[in-house]
Amino acid sequence: MPKVVSLCCGIIESQLETDCHGIYRTAANERIKNEVEEEMNKSMENAHALEQLRDVKICASVLKSFFRQLPDPLFTDKLYPAFIEAAGIADDVTRLKIIRNLIIDLPQYHYGTAKFFLHHLKKISGHDLKNLEKKSIKIYI
């Protein structure tokens, strides 16, 4: 599990009681986000920069940036077409069964990270609809 993922998700989840409207939709201050990323790139020991900020929008932006910069996307280039095809299946039961099987087929590192992040999204969407609407989750992943 990448430390940046567990750290950012943990900070976001710890702030769910506050007004976190548009956690993954609203852009954070780009300059601050870049400063935090630079510190983290120097050493994950500098991850305290995120914890000190306690700003969910910065954490969400750092997390989105991390996923965008992966050399092989979380849902892998190889399996991506199958995920897209599965998303178009009308029958809920069939669609979920196929998507679960595709997630299981992910490489181990991707599987663990995807499982953790999807659980995080479930926590957020289940906590308060203003934080992340369930119908919008597919946009972010």
PLM features: residue spans?
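Alpha-helical catalytic/interaction cores of small GTPase-regulatory modules
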Residues: 1-141
